Amino acid sequence: MFELNRKSTEMSMLSKAGGGTAYDFSDIRPIGSPIRNGENGKSDGIIPFIKGYDSWILASKQGSLRRGAVAIYLNAEHEEFPDFLEIREPKGEVQRQCHNIHQGAIFTDDFMNKVVDKNGKERELWLATLKKRVKTGEPYTMFIDNANKVVPEWWKTHNLKIHHSNLCSEIFLPTDENHSLVCCLSSLNLAKYDEWKDTNTVFLATLFLDAVISEFLEKAKDIKGIEDTVRFAEKSRALGLGTLGWHSYLQSKMIPFHGLEARSLTRLIFGDIRKKAEEATMYMGSKYGSPLWCEGTGRRNLTLLAVAPNRSSSKLAGGVSQGVEPLAGNVYVDDDAKGLHIRRNPYLENLLISKGKNLPEIWDQISEDKGSVQNIRSLTKEEKEVFLTFKEINQLELVRQAAVRQEYLDQGQSINLAFFQDAPAKWINQVHVEAWKLGLKALYYLRSESNLRADSKMQRDLYSECLACEG
């Protein structure tokens, strides 16, 4: 009980400072479990505690800008997992509804093997999870064994183990009762990749993030309530350098998002970023020393790379595509603090200009088709492939590309999926299972027309992310 309250205080303090938070409730007794062999009665289960966190996060604000945010993770084998799936729904007992938290579901290899073998209970829980993702966008799906089986050997020296991810499902760092993860993130603009690929940009960005860790330690050391995060940062100095503008870069080269060419570029670019980031951490290790969890490695940092969603940062970078995901449409309405604005894909616009087809009726057709160019006769088949929208892209190809990228990321990546409303359940299941088989550590939101409509009715931001994940 004390630890649950202590962590809720930590959550509030971190949210107030602009950080997203996440906690794993898998070790809490399920409802009806005896407390101290029944001497103290029976447990009320996890939902009342999650409800407490739900209320606390509502009262916590990230500066003066917006309320705080937290993700609660739960292993699918926990007895209360079916109830956990329902807590964000506006139905049932009010005291068991939690509309302000985000959900993450944890799946082991053993569980997933039983899903593939179509075993009863596991298969039912998995399908219930997918149905909820189609309806609400959540829970995030975390494949915990994919995360832990690729950690370096030197993690094991300190018994470091990953238990859960973060609010945006790209962070994979070790935690325990005395250590809470810290996200230290920034992103490289891949839309400008050709301008910085032969410079020391990656090297300097890695040094910059390490300096941010130093500043955090200096400012946070005397703040009550976040001692576990300070302790974690001191021992790990973990970083998460990522990217944004990936789809914009591909379109600038007239390369389709799906296919071998995009996968080859993924390997080339992220392999290069990893190599240069490794050089930077070894340089800092030799110059400034290694933290406790990196002793004997010569490194300055426990981790180096993680790809965040970067929704707001992508706007600030000139309206490039978010993170590593495809553009949702080639024309869309952007709702920001200054009002509503119609945004057009600049690469498509340049192509239409070159063809003498940058006409109002063309853009009206694209708008009518929800951002799609597939009915624009003046574009060739190859050009239409380049400007496929998120939902038009084969989601299996998106997962395969992410698997290539994951080889170079020591943490993870925020990977959203998008399906048309009439997508067969079998296809949605296949894509999710393939993500696990290919080694992805997690999947973020599932975007569909149904969950966008449902969330609009509840007046809640479906794609919440913390300030750190906008780095």
State the predicted function of each range.
Residues 4-7, 238-256, 427-440:
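Hydrophobic/aromatic-rich, well-ordered segments within soluble, folded domains that form packed cores
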Residues 1, 45-49, 73-77, 160-164, ...:
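Secondary-structure capping and boundary motifs in well-ordered enzyme cores
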Residues 1-38, 46-49, 60, 133-233, ...:
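Function-dense linear segments that define catalytic or interfacial modules
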Residues 28, 38-52, 63-160, 243-291, ...:
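Conserved, charged catalytic cores of large soluble enzymes
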Residues 162-163, 168-175, 217-219, 305-471:
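Catalytic alpha/beta core of large soluble enzyme barrels
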Residues 17-29, 69-72, 256-259, 415, ...:
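Glycine-rich phosphate/pyrophosphate-binding loops
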Residues 11, 60, 128-131, 172, ...:
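Generic recognition of flexible, low-complexity loop/linker segments
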